[in-house]
């Protein structure tokens, strides 16, 4: 996906990028590749691949959810900033918090935010399991997002405690989402979530399947969740 295709395919979906926003994506790409030589941020470094599999793929969430309001967003395990930083570039009014367990990635994100001149962004070095217990952030976000980090039953325990009642958990998944939903239904129920919508589409050019799940937070999450670091992964909430 070259820059012209990136721009026109977003335009088709009603997302028009200014020259400044296009410049921010260029700076993002250059900074990502430069830092990737020092630390492992991504296996994808070829420019057209980064634009398709990182930038465009992150923004697809906005094809199925309206980001036009100044929502507070928490991105869990964003690594090099996906999906929330590409969304923040497209929708500068969003208030973004990224939680990541690796300090080196947080250092990269702080540097990136300065280079991109982003405001209303915060980067927290923490495990999602401990972050989700903290006063002031628990059940405080309009939207919590995660992109293909873990299976749905595990991801729900890391993300739903952070979503305010009435808010939305957006899980961005690859193929095999149906199986994950089946195995994750019980966790959603326990944690106060309700699957409202699942959208399946092909990522352009490479035709790989993507699924975006919109999960509404209906009820407060019981206090015991999330459990201790590592437990959600070892003992997922599944029947």
Curated annotation (Swiss-Prot):
Protein name, per record: Ribosomal RNA small subunit methyltransferase G
Binding-site residues, S-adenosyl-L-methionine: 77, 82, 128-129, 147
Functional description taken from the UniProt entry: Specifically methylates the N7 position of guanine in position 535 of 16S rRNA.
GO molecular function: rRNA (guanine-N7-)-methyltransferase activity
Domain of life: Bacteria
SUPFAM superfamilies: S-adenosyl-L-methionine-dependent methyltransferases (SSF53335)
Places the protein is found: Cytoplasm
Family that this chain belongs to: Belongs to the methyltransferase superfamily. RNA methyltransferase RsmG family.
Keywords, ordered alphabetically: Cytoplasm, Methyltransferase, rRNA processing, S-adenosyl-L-methionine, Transferase
Keyword flag Acyltransferase: no
InterPro entries: rRNA_ssu_MeTfrase_G (IPR003682), SAM-dependent_MTases_sf (IPR029063)
EC number: 2.1.1.-
Principal localisation: cytoplasm
A Gene Ontology cellular-component term: cytosol
HAMAP family from the UniProt entry: 16SrRNA_methyltr_G (MF_00074)
Pfam families in alphabetical order: GidB (PF02527)
Organism: Bacillus anthracis
């Amino acid at each position: 996906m070259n820059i012209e295709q990136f721009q026109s395919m977003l335009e088709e979906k009603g997302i028009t990028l200014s020259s400044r926003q296009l410049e921010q994506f260029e700076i993002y790409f250059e900074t990502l590749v430069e830092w990737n030589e020092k630390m492992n941020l991504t296996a994808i470094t070829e420019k057209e691949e980064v634009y398709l599999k990182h930038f465009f793929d992150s923004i697809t969430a906005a094809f199925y959810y309206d980001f036009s309001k100044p929502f507070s967003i928490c991105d869990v395990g964003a690594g090099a900033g996906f999906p929330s930083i590409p969304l923040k570039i497209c929708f500068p009014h969003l208030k973004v918090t990224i939680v990541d367990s690796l300090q080196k990635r947080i250092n990269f994100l702080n540097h990136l935010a300065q280079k991109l001149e982003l405001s209303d962004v915060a980067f927290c070095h923490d495990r999602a399991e401990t972050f989700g217990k903290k006063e002031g952030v628990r059940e405080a976000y309009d939207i919590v997002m995660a992109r293909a980090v873990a299976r749905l039953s595990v991801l729900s325990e890391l993300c739903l405690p952070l979503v305010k009642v009435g808010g939305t958990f957006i899980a961005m998944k690859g193929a095999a989402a149906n199986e994950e939903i089946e195995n994750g239904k019980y966790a959603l129920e326990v944690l106060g979530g309700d699957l409202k919508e699942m959208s399946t589409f092909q990522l352009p050019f490479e035709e790989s399947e993507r699924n975006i799940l919109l999960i509404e937070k209906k009820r407060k999450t019981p206090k015991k969740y999330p459990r201790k670091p590592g437990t959600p992964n070892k003992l997922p909430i599944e029947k």
